[in-house]
């Protein structure tokens, strides 16, 4: 039996409650919108153009790795911005979030989703080995890394897959932006500290026979500035070319990780 050894990290339940309160408040504001208004706030609608390439690739990975015969869990689904892409595969989708208010908004947008679980991502009240694929978009930092990784491995069936889009924590410019969000109370201190790093990616990947990672956003920080001089459309095209021909993990902002053929076992 393979043993999973995870790094030490002290959880902060108070911060988790702060995050829940924040997203409950955001969801309650969204709940005032009409159904038509909610339905246009999905996928990449409203996302900055230079970031769309990341989400387009994430959606492509979902389409390639999920089919209608699979049971899929989306961790930290929030109000369902990206849930529709999974639903379109025909898979049996379960969505999870700590904010009940967020899932209520999601239900209005996607009434066909029947399985909703209100809980922390690191304590999902579901039987072990229930899912063929686990998906997460931008939510890894909202739970203790030790417990969350164990929970992912507990819930995933042998041979299963993991698809993650998230941010990286080693670019100083992006770090500064997250610290600013902490001071204006848009993020908790723990969620800033727990942004994934390359070591976290390695720990998640090692229990799968196959894994593939693609980095994005090395040049995001300069695109807005560049847009003032050459126009935003040309700046976006420049970003796409730079990402294509000069990809780099060193200063990347985001990553998409796809792991297949889970072979690990929880202790």
Name each region found by the language model.
Residues 1-66, 69-78, 163-186:
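Conserved class I S-adenosyl-L-methionine
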Residues 79-123:
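Class I SAM-dependent methyltransferase SAM/SAH-binding core
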Residues 135:
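A conserved beta-strand element that flanks and buttresses the S-adenosyl-L-methionine
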Residues 147-158:
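A short glycine-rich, Lys/Arg-flanked "PGG" loop and its adjoining helix->strand segment in the class I
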Residues 181, 214-267:
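A C-terminal cap/extension of S-adenosyl-L-methionine-dependent methyltransferases
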Residues 192-209, 213:
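Short alpha-helix
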